Amino acid sequence: MALQRTHSLLLLLLLTLLGLGLVQPSYGQDGMYQRFLRQHVHPEETGGSDRYCNLMMQRRKMTLYHCKRFNTFIHEDIWNIRSICSTTNIQCKNGKMNCHEGVVKVTDCRDTGSSRAPNCRYRAMASTRRVVIACEGNPQVPVHFDG
């Protein structure tokens, strides 16, 4: 009887801890969130060079079958990026009203057009600028880089 009670208490404790933790987005949004992280988030401030873009675009699997023409890496902590989702909603390029804007440090990587996948070559441009991201879920998380 005591063992069963201990197991019940442990299960209750586990469920309580899970409940106190961050609420995870739904599976569909989680996949989009993970893709956003892979394609756009690099908290270290090591961007800015062509070499950086060439390496990161390859590491993040954006050059496997074709050279992605343009990509932006955000050099901010994920919590700073997620906080953008709590700003006022604005209209996205696709017409939806789930976009938000904020100012962050970025490296923009633009395909030079002189190479072929998987050995794509990029030009880098580092700056601090306004970005627009689409957010979904509860809590809201970034799922798409809109500009």
Swiss-Prot record:
Sorted UniProt keywords: Antibiotic, Antimicrobial, Disulfide bond, Endonuclease, Hydrolase, Nuclease, Pyrrolidone carboxylic acid, Secreted, Signal
Q: Where is dUMP bound in this sequence?
A: 35, 40, 68, 71-72, 145
SUPFAM superfamilies named in the record = RNase A-like
BP terms from Gene Ontology = antibacterial humoral response; defense response to Gram-positive bacterium
One Pfam family recorded for the sequence? RnaseA
GO CC terms: extracellular space
Signal peptide range: 1-28
Q: What is its main location?
A: secreted
Do you know which Gene3D superfamilies this protein is assigned to?
A: Ribonuclease A-like domain (3.10.130.10)
- Subcellular locations according to the entry: Secreted
MF terms per GO, please? Answer: endonuclease activity; nucleic acid binding; RNA nuclease activity
User: Could you tell me which InterPro entries the record lists for this protein?
Assistant: RNaseA, RNaseA-like_dom_sf, RNaseA_AS, RNaseA_domain
Provide the E.C. number(s) assigned to this enzyme.
Answer: 3.1.27.-
Bilayer-spanning residue ranges: none
**CDD domains per the record?**
RNase_A_canonical
Where, per the database record, does this protein carry Pyrrolidone carboxylic acid?
29
Catalytic positions? 40 (proton acceptor), 144 (proton donor)
Q: List the disulfide bonds.
A: 53-109, 67-120, 85-135, 92-99
Similarity annotation: Belongs to the pancreatic ribonuclease family.
Reported function: Cleaves preferentially after uridine bases. Has antimicrobial activity against uropathogenic E.coli (UPEC). Probably contributes to urinary tract sterility.
Output this protein's name. Answer: Ribonuclease 4
Source organism per entry reads Pan troglodytes
